[in-house]
Amino acid sequence: TAEKIGDKKLAQAFSGEDAVDINETQHFEKYDVTLMGIASGEDIAECVTEKNGEILNDRTYIVTAVSRTDGTPMPENAADEAYGDMRFFVSPLIQGCNPALVNVISMDGVYTEFIQDDVLYRLTECSNIEIFADRTVYLCVSDGDLYNEEAYNYDESTGEITRAEDYKGVNALFELPLDPALADPEAAEEYLAPLTGEEEEASDEDAYLLGSKEADAFMEKVTPDNIDQYAERIEDSVQTFGADE
């Protein structure tokens, strides 16, 4: 697949000992979905992806294949009525992360695809997922252009992601065989913070704590003898209560 798109360096990476060949297929009513393999690392491809002028060089590359169960060719021409059905969302998903927030889109993902021998091949790339190797890392392939919450279930208590068995369509879900020794929990948490909102929540909490400290410091300066220096008595708001009230 990498050779087909003209990236010889990436093709060599997929042939190397660090690449993982999987070739697992899941079957659906209209389509068969195959996870072919994964390669990850720094500077393993000739074609580079940029974000805000910065080259993203530490990447994961995933190859998938989709074919029709009845053996008919995948449509190549936009004029074909079935061409509009050939929309698939391919994304790694991370255990413990809401997949609606953390997926290939938020992970700086891009893809290239082509049809060969009646099969749709897609090369998906995103940020290197090996830092999450101490968790279960999934790959979803579903119909549509975006993550479909109806196609999968996310258990917030366990962080597990599963297929919605009653979903009528394509909702393949593979577990990626990553080496736990490659995990980097500290880097993973740092990477996830802006994606999951934890960074913003932390900033809000810091602001709240700072405000509380400033309020405490102010109140420590106020005494019954000097309160008139800091506050103005408003007669209309004064209420007097006796022991009988």
Where is each model-derived feature located?
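Single-pass transmembrane signal-anchor helices and their membrane-water interface zones
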Residues: 1-9
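Polar, acidic low-complexity tracts enriched in Ser/Thr/Gln/Glu with frequent Gly/Pro and Thr-Pro motifs
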Residues: 11-245
